[in-house]
Amino acid sequence: MADLNYIDWHIHPFRAERWLEIWRPALDRALAFGARSCYLTRDVDDPLHFRQVTVWDDHADFERYWYSDEITALREAALNYFNKPLSSSWHTVAVDASGVEAPPLK
């Protein structure tokens, strides 16, 4: 079963759009390195908080992606736009309700 990697990005005030412009290509590259899916969410209550979620079959593919020359260069280009340190965390799917049909409402 695939594992999910989460990275919480906390962006400096007035820098979110520029950071997003720099970091957007990194999301596409995750797919090229073998991620099943990749998306970025933005907190409704805190628009400076972004969460990057990637789904991987193999942690080694994430490591190849994260430490690749391309992604390292993008992180360096975005260095002045986000709070450090960055930390990622791994999650496994505990329940997947997508294949379960909901019972009819009464």
What are these regions (language model features)?
Residues M1-T72, Y81-K106:
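Short S/T/G/P-rich N-terminal loop/turn motif that feeds into the first structured element of a domain
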